[in-house]
Structures are given as C-alpha cells and as structure tokens.
Regions:
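Conserved catalytic or regulatory cores that recognize and/or transform ribose-phosphate-containing ligands
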Residues: 1-114
Length: 114
C-alpha cells in the first residue's frame, strides 16, 4: 500500500527528521511511503503544492502527522482529500495496526469542523 505522509513543514526546524522517522516506521510496517520532506528547498509554495498533489494522487491513502492542523499546506491537503474522497488516517492510528481497520481519520476531523 502506498501512503502519502502529510504534516507541518514550514516553520518546523526539525521537520526532515520528524518526517524521516515517520517514514521509517511506516516502511517497517510494509508500506511504501511518499514523503514530501525529501523535496529540495528553494521552490515556491505553489510548486511544492503541485508536486504534493501529484504525490497524493499516486497514494492509496494519506496519513496525517501530529500538528497537521497547524500547517496551511497540510490543511489544503486535508481539504483536497475530503473533497475528492481520498482515504485519510491519523499517523498514530496507522502505526497501531492495519490501516483498513482504523476508524478515526482526518476526514472525520474535517467533517466536524465544517
């Protein structure tokens, strides 16, 4: 299963380490991970978002790291997933077991907010 890893990047000093650790944990569970933190620095926000949307489209599911609600980019990704019907899961729950058995999703949170 291909998993896109969504979460806060801008303004987070150790984002690469956080994303790498999450990627490693997911990989150890057998997932193929699309990690946006590997993208090079120096591009525009629009360029990053275009690449990330393509990554999301290539993934089977999107998993959201802690603090994603505080990231403008991750909120855009969550909205995109919500409106296009993509499966989304909180990272903590994916790490607990089979993603197909997970009930609490980013879409659940998005629906509660409106």
């Amino acid at each position: 299963m291909i998993v896109y890893l969504a979460g806060p990047i801008t303004g987070v000093a150790d984002y690469r380490q956080r994303f790498y650790m999450a990627e490693r944990k997911l990989t150890d569970l057998g997932y193929t991970v699309l990690n946006p933190a590997i993208l090079p620095e120096g591009m525009s926000k629009a360029a990053y978002m275009r690449i990330c949307m393509a990554m999301i489209e290539s993934a089977d599911v999107v998993t959201f790291m802690p603090g994603w609600q505080n990231s403008a980019g991750a909120r855009i990704e969550a909205d995109y997933c919500f409106y296009t019907g993509r499966k989304t899961y909180a990272l903590e729950l994916v790490l607990l077991g089979d993603v197909e058995k997970t009930e609490k999703t980013a879409n659940d949170e998005r629906e509660q907010v409106g």
